[in-house]
Protein backbone atom coordinates (compact mmCIF):
# COMPACT_ATOMS: atom_id res chain seq x y z
CA UNK A 1 0.00 0.00 0.00
CA UNK A 2 2.82 2.38 0.87
CA UNK A 3 4.59 1.60 -2.42
CA UNK A 4 1.36 2.31 -4.29
CA UNK A 5 1.10 5.71 -2.57
CA UNK A 6 4.66 6.58 -3.55
CA UNK A 7 4.14 5.56 -7.18
CA UNK A 8 0.83 7.42 -7.41
CA UNK A 9 2.35 10.53 -5.80
CA UNK A 10 5.24 10.41 -8.29
CA UNK A 11 2.93 10.05 -11.31
CA UNK A 12 0.62 12.85 -10.13
CA UNK A 13 3.62 15.10 -9.44
CA UNK A 14 4.90 14.58 -12.99
CA UNK A 15 1.45 15.38 -14.39
CA UNK A 16 0.97 18.49 -12.24
CA UNK A 17 4.40 19.96 -12.98
CA UNK A 18 3.96 19.14 -16.67
CA UNK A 19 0.70 21.08 -16.72
CA UNK A 20 2.26 23.92 -14.71
CA UNK A 21 5.14 24.19 -17.17
CA UNK A 22 2.81 24.08 -20.17
CA UNK A 23 0.62 26.94 -18.96
CA UNK A 24 3.63 29.04 -17.92
CA UNK A 25 5.45 28.95 -21.26
CA UNK A 26 4.68 31.86 -23.57
CA UNK A 27 4.35 30.31 -27.01
CA UNK A 28 5.13 32.47 -30.08
CA UNK A 29 1.89 33.61 -31.66
CA UNK A 30 1.22 33.62 -35.40
CA UNK A 31 -0.78 36.69 -36.37
CA UNK A 32 -2.12 37.72 -39.75
CA UNK A 33 -4.21 40.54 -41.12
CA UNK A 34 -5.66 40.84 -44.63
CA UNK A 35 -7.10 44.01 -46.13
CA UNK A 36 -7.88 44.80 -49.79
CA UNK A 37 -5.69 41.97 -51.01
CA UNK A 38 -2.76 42.98 -48.79
CA UNK A 39 -1.63 40.29 -46.36
CA UNK A 40 0.71 40.98 -43.45
CA UNK A 41 1.77 38.13 -41.17
CA UNK A 42 4.21 37.70 -38.31
CA UNK A 43 5.20 35.11 -35.71
CA UNK A 44 5.79 36.96 -32.46
CA UNK A 45 9.02 36.83 -30.49
CA UNK A 46 8.21 36.20 -26.82
CA UNK A 47 11.64 36.31 -25.20
CA UNK A 48 15.32 37.01 -25.70
CA UNK A 49 17.68 34.99 -23.54
CA UNK A 50 21.14 36.46 -23.18
CA UNK A 51 22.61 39.55 -24.79
CA UNK A 52 21.82 40.60 -28.34
CA UNK A 53 19.25 42.36 -30.49
CA UNK A 54 15.81 40.90 -31.14
CA UNK A 55 15.21 40.26 -34.82
CA UNK A 56 11.63 40.84 -35.93
CA UNK A 57 10.54 39.17 -39.17
CA UNK A 58 7.35 39.79 -41.13
CA UNK A 59 5.84 38.59 -44.39
CA UNK A 60 4.11 41.13 -46.63
CA UNK A 61 2.17 40.10 -49.72
CA UNK A 62 0.73 42.87 -51.90
CA UNK A 63 -1.50 42.49 -54.99
CA UNK A 64 0.37 45.09 -57.08
CA UNK A 65 4.17 44.95 -56.71
CA UNK A 66 4.53 48.33 -58.41
CA UNK A 67 2.69 50.07 -55.58
CA UNK A 68 4.90 51.64 -52.95
CA UNK A 69 4.32 50.65 -49.33
CA UNK A 70 6.34 51.20 -46.18
CA UNK A 71 6.42 48.60 -43.41
CA UNK A 72 7.63 49.80 -40.01
CA UNK A 73 8.33 48.29 -36.61
CA UNK A 74 7.15 50.32 -33.62
CA UNK A 75 8.52 49.41 -30.19
CA UNK A 76 8.74 50.89 -26.71
CA UNK A 77 10.45 49.84 -23.51
CA UNK A 78 8.15 49.01 -20.61
CA UNK A 79 4.41 49.22 -20.26
CA UNK A 80 2.65 52.55 -19.95
CA UNK A 81 2.19 55.72 -21.93
CA UNK A 82 5.74 55.99 -23.28
CA UNK A 83 6.41 56.91 -26.89
CA UNK A 84 7.05 54.26 -29.50
CA UNK A 85 10.25 54.27 -31.54
CA UNK A 86 9.75 53.69 -35.25
CA UNK A 87 12.14 51.61 -37.38
CA UNK A 88 11.61 50.99 -41.09
CA UNK A 89 11.69 47.29 -41.87
CA UNK A 90 14.07 46.30 -44.65
CA UNK A 91 13.68 43.53 -47.25
CA UNK A 92 15.42 40.30 -46.36
CA UNK A 93 18.08 39.51 -48.93
CA UNK A 94 17.08 36.76 -51.33
CA UNK A 95 13.34 37.05 -50.66
CA UNK A 96 10.47 38.96 -52.24
CA UNK A 97 8.07 39.20 -49.33
CA UNK A 98 10.19 39.00 -46.16
CA UNK A 99 11.08 42.08 -44.11
CA UNK A 100 13.08 42.51 -40.93
CA UNK A 101 14.06 45.03 -38.26
CA UNK A 102 15.57 44.75 -34.80
CA UNK A 103 14.74 45.80 -31.27
CA UNK A 104 18.05 46.76 -29.61
CA UNK A 105 19.40 44.58 -26.82
CA UNK A 106 18.15 45.47 -23.33
CA UNK A 107 19.26 44.47 -19.82
CA UNK A 108 17.68 41.33 -18.40
CA UNK A 109 14.36 41.97 -16.73
CA UNK A 110 13.31 44.61 -19.26
CA UNK A 111 10.28 44.28 -21.51
CA UNK A 112 9.65 45.62 -24.98
CA UNK A 113 6.22 46.06 -26.54
CA UNK A 114 5.97 46.22 -30.31
CA UNK A 115 3.66 46.18 -33.29
CA UNK A 116 3.93 46.44 -37.08
CA UNK A 117 2.42 49.18 -39.21
CA UNK A 118 1.99 49.39 -42.99
CA UNK A 119 1.61 52.76 -44.72
CA UNK A 120 1.06 53.76 -48.33
CA UNK A 121 3.19 56.11 -50.41
CA UNK A 122 1.41 59.11 -48.88
CA UNK A 123 2.23 58.02 -45.35
CA UNK A 124 -1.33 56.97 -44.61
CA UNK A 125 -1.59 54.01 -42.24
CA UNK A 126 -3.31 51.08 -43.96
CA UNK A 127 -3.15 48.36 -41.33
CA UNK A 128 -1.39 47.28 -38.17
CA UNK A 129 -0.44 43.97 -36.62
CA UNK A 130 -1.94 43.24 -34.13
CA UNK A 131 -4.94 44.56 -36.02
CA UNK A 132 -6.46 46.43 -33.08
CA UNK A 133 -4.29 48.32 -30.63
CA UNK A 134 -6.04 49.34 -27.42
CA UNK A 135 -6.01 48.64 -23.69
CA UNK A 136 -7.73 45.30 -24.22
CA UNK A 137 -5.61 44.19 -27.18
CA UNK A 138 -2.01 44.89 -26.33
CA UNK A 139 0.95 44.88 -28.72
CA UNK A 140 3.31 41.93 -28.84
CA UNK A 141 5.52 41.50 -25.79
CA UNK A 142 9.13 40.33 -25.69
CA UNK A 143 10.90 39.72 -22.38
CA UNK A 144 14.66 40.06 -21.99
CA UNK A 145 16.10 37.35 -19.76
CA UNK A 146 19.47 36.27 -18.50
CA UNK A 147 20.80 32.76 -18.93
CA UNK A 148 20.29 30.35 -16.03
CA UNK A 149 22.94 27.59 -16.03
CA UNK A 150 21.80 23.95 -15.75
CA UNK A 151 23.56 23.51 -12.40
CA UNK A 152 21.20 26.15 -10.94
CA UNK A 153 17.90 25.45 -12.67
CA UNK A 154 18.34 21.66 -12.34
CA UNK A 155 18.46 21.51 -8.52
CA UNK A 156 15.73 24.17 -8.31
CA UNK A 157 13.34 22.10 -10.42
CA UNK A 158 14.32 18.87 -8.65
CA UNK A 159 13.68 20.31 -5.18
CA UNK A 160 10.33 21.80 -6.19
CA UNK A 161 9.40 18.46 -7.77
CA UNK A 162 10.29 16.66 -4.55
CA UNK A 163 8.30 19.13 -2.44
CA UNK A 164 5.17 18.55 -4.55
CA UNK A 165 5.74 14.79 -4.26
CA UNK A 166 5.57 15.09 -0.47
CA UNK A 167 2.52 17.36 -0.68
CA UNK A 168 0.70 14.55 -2.51
CA UNK A 169 1.76 12.19 0.28
CA UNK A 170 0.36 14.70 2.77
CA UNK A 171 -2.95 14.55 0.89
CA UNK A 172 -3.09 10.75 0.90
CA UNK A 173 -2.16 10.54 4.58
CA UNK A 174 -4.69 13.21 5.55
CA UNK A 175 -7.43 11.26 3.79
CA UNK A 176 -6.37 8.10 5.62
CA UNK A 177 -6.68 9.92 8.94
CA UNK A 178 -10.18 11.12 8.09
CA UNK A 179 -11.07 7.51 7.28
CA UNK A 180 -9.93 6.43 10.75
CA UNK A 181 -6.33 5.31 10.23
CA UNK A 182 -3.70 6.49 12.72
CA UNK A 183 -1.25 8.15 10.28
CA UNK A 184 -0.37 11.25 12.29
CA UNK A 185 3.34 10.44 12.42
CA UNK A 186 3.48 9.98 8.65
CA UNK A 187 1.57 13.22 8.14
CA UNK A 188 4.05 15.13 10.27
CA UNK A 189 7.08 13.66 8.48
CA UNK A 190 5.68 14.31 5.01
CA UNK A 191 4.68 17.89 5.87
CA UNK A 192 8.13 18.54 7.35
CA UNK A 193 9.84 17.37 4.18
CA UNK A 194 7.41 19.32 1.99
CA UNK A 195 8.28 22.49 3.91
CA UNK A 196 12.04 21.93 3.90
CA UNK A 197 12.18 21.14 0.19
CA UNK A 198 9.88 24.06 -0.71
CA UNK A 199 12.16 26.38 1.25
CA UNK A 200 15.39 25.10 -0.32
CA UNK A 201 13.99 25.11 -3.85
CA UNK A 202 12.02 28.34 -3.54
CA UNK A 203 14.19 30.63 -1.43
CA UNK A 204 17.96 30.25 -1.94
CA UNK A 205 17.66 28.63 -5.37
CA UNK A 206 14.46 30.45 -6.33
CA UNK A 207 16.05 33.81 -5.52
CA UNK A 208 19.15 32.85 -7.52
CA UNK A 209 17.03 31.83 -10.52
CA UNK A 210 15.12 35.13 -10.33
CA UNK A 211 18.34 37.11 -10.09
CA UNK A 212 19.95 35.34 -13.04
CA UNK A 213 16.78 35.61 -15.14
CA UNK A 214 15.52 39.10 -14.34
CA UNK A 215 18.33 40.77 -12.38
CA UNK A 216 16.23 41.00 -9.21
CA UNK A 217 16.86 39.56 -5.76
CA UNK A 218 13.22 39.17 -4.74
CA UNK A 219 10.20 40.45 -6.60
CA UNK A 220 7.34 39.00 -4.60
CA UNK A 221 5.17 39.52 -1.53
CA UNK A 222 5.47 41.30 0.85
CA UNK A 223 7.83 43.72 -0.94
CA UNK A 224 6.83 43.53 -4.61
CA UNK A 225 4.16 41.89 -6.77
CA UNK A 226 5.98 39.33 -8.93
CA UNK A 227 3.67 36.32 -9.33
CA UNK A 228 6.27 33.58 -9.05
CA UNK A 229 8.01 34.95 -5.96
CA UNK A 230 4.67 35.78 -4.32
CA UNK A 231 3.51 32.19 -4.84
CA UNK A 232 6.64 30.96 -3.09
CA UNK A 233 5.99 33.30 -0.14
CA UNK A 234 2.37 32.19 0.28
CA UNK A 235 3.25 28.50 -0.02
CA UNK A 236 6.06 28.66 2.53
CA UNK A 237 3.97 30.73 4.94
CA UNK A 238 1.19 28.13 4.92
CA UNK A 239 3.43 25.11 5.41
CA UNK A 240 5.39 26.80 8.20
CA UNK A 241 2.09 27.54 9.97
CA UNK A 242 1.10 23.90 9.47
CA UNK A 243 4.39 22.75 11.02
CA UNK A 244 3.72 24.95 14.04
CA UNK A 245 0.29 23.36 14.43
CA UNK A 246 1.74 19.85 14.21
CA UNK A 247 5.04 20.63 15.97
CA UNK A 248 4.71 17.91 18.62
CA UNK A 249 4.67 15.15 16.01
CA UNK A 250 6.90 16.88 13.44
CA UNK A 251 9.82 17.61 15.77
CA UNK A 252 9.42 14.70 18.15
CA UNK A 253 6.88 12.12 19.17
CA UNK A 254 4.91 14.16 21.66
CA UNK A 255 1.42 14.29 20.20
CA UNK A 256 0.23 16.32 23.19
CA UNK A 257 2.21 19.33 21.95
CA UNK A 258 0.22 19.53 18.72
CA UNK A 259 -2.01 22.60 18.67
CA UNK A 260 -4.96 20.91 16.97
CA UNK A 261 -6.64 17.49 17.17
CA UNK A 262 -5.74 14.85 14.60
CA UNK A 263 -8.71 15.30 12.27
CA UNK A 264 -8.30 19.08 12.23
CA UNK A 265 -4.66 18.59 11.23
CA UNK A 266 -5.81 16.23 8.48
CA UNK A 267 -8.10 18.94 7.12
CA UNK A 268 -5.22 21.42 7.26
CA UNK A 269 -3.15 18.94 5.25
CA UNK A 270 -5.87 18.69 2.60
CA UNK A 271 -6.17 22.47 2.50
CA UNK A 272 -2.39 22.68 2.04
CA UNK A 273 -2.64 20.36 -0.95
CA UNK A 274 -5.45 22.44 -2.47
CA UNK A 275 -3.42 25.62 -1.96
CA UNK A 276 -0.32 24.04 -3.50
CA UNK A 277 -2.33 22.76 -6.46
CA UNK A 278 -3.88 26.19 -7.07
CA UNK A 279 -0.55 27.98 -6.80
CA UNK A 280 1.19 25.66 -9.25
CA UNK A 281 -1.64 26.12 -11.74
CA UNK A 282 -1.09 29.90 -11.71
CA UNK A 283 1.35 30.62 -14.58
CA UNK A 284 4.90 31.62 -13.65
CA UNK A 285 6.02 35.17 -14.39
CA UNK A 286 9.09 33.65 -16.02
PLM regions and their residue ranges:
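Glycan-association/targeting regions that enable binding to alpha-glucans and other polysaccharides
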Residues: 1-167, 171-185, 197, 201, ...
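Generic detector of multi-pass transmembrane helix bundles and their immediately adjacent loops
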Residues: 219-224, 228-286
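N-terminal low-hydrophobic presequence detector
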Residues: 154-156, 160, 191, 231, ...
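A loop-to-helix transmembrane entry motif
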Residues: 190-200, 223-231
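Residue-level detector of functional hotspots within protein domains
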Residues: 143, 189, 193, 207, ...
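C-terminal TM-helix exit segments that contain a strictly Trp-centered aromatic cap at the helix terminus
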Residues: 200-212, 276-286
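Membrane-helix boundary/interface segments in integral membrane proteins
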Residues: 209-221
